[in-house]
Amino acid sequence: MPTSDSGEPRRIAMKPNGVTVPISDQQEQLPCPRCDSSNTKFCYYNNYNFSQPRHFCKACRRYWTHGGTLRDVPVGGGTRKSAKRSRTCSNSSSSSVSGVVSNSNGVPLQTTPVLFPQSSISNGVTHTVTESDGKGSALSLCGSFTSTLLNHNAAATATHGSGSVIGIGGFGIGLGSGFDDVSFGLGRAMWPFSTVGTATTTNVGSNGGHHAVPMPATWQFEGLESNAGGGFVSGEYFAWPDLSITTPGNSLK
């Protein structure tokens, strides 16, 4: 190993091309320019440039280039472990914020009432909301729905001669007449056909006239030509009793 004039051994630095260069004094332990600590070490040369030796301070865990400009990095920055701690703290803070949002100062969120207009239009029939449907314009859902069904059914009965919606009052929720004639408490169905009639309504014949169609007992029809027992009505329609459903008689031939 080559020695210096003073007799001390000298370390040799190897270039990438194989040329040996003696290590200068810049590779020795230099004080840290940030914290003035002597616990430093030489790391490498920037881009293999011997004029830019790179050093590392073990005290403040920062790199610097001897003779270069120090970056504006705060002294005493955190390591990876501290970064993990900060990430955990951020998660806990976000969870606490979400808890505050879900429970705003311990006061439960109040439900917003559903507002309906004072009048609603359905199939050309105007229904005016009264005080019995609800308090003010904030109506209870059950009351407004019930009144809408009842008024719509009554208006359709006055327009077409029979109900144009299916009555579901037999379900026990107070929505008017239902399927009670089906013998299990559901009431008579009312289908949206203009030529359909109940036991006391009228049907439109082929000549444009009106005639009464009596309805027999549930699910019973007697002769094909009997108007009283169901079957063919005036030779043109086949009626299912108590369901007020008519189909062309020619379809059964």
Curated annotation (Swiss-Prot):
GO terms for molecular function: DNA binding; DNA-binding transcription factor activity; transcription cis-regulatory region binding; zinc ion binding. Pfam families: Zn_ribbon_Dof. Residues 73-103 are annotated as: Disordered. GO terms for biological process: cell wall modification; positive regulation of cell cycle; positive regulation of DNA-templated transcription; response to auxin; response to salicylic acid. Constitutively expressed in the whole plant. Keywords: DNA-binding, Metal-binding, Nucleus, Transcription, Transcription regulation, Zinc, Zinc-finger. It is found in: Nucleus. Transcription factor that binds specifically to a 5'-AA[AG]G-3' consensus core sequence. Enhances the DNA binding of OBF transcription factors to OCS elements. Interacts with OBF4 or OBF5. This is Dof zinc finger protein DOF3.4. It comes from Arabidopsis thaliana (Mouse-ear cress).
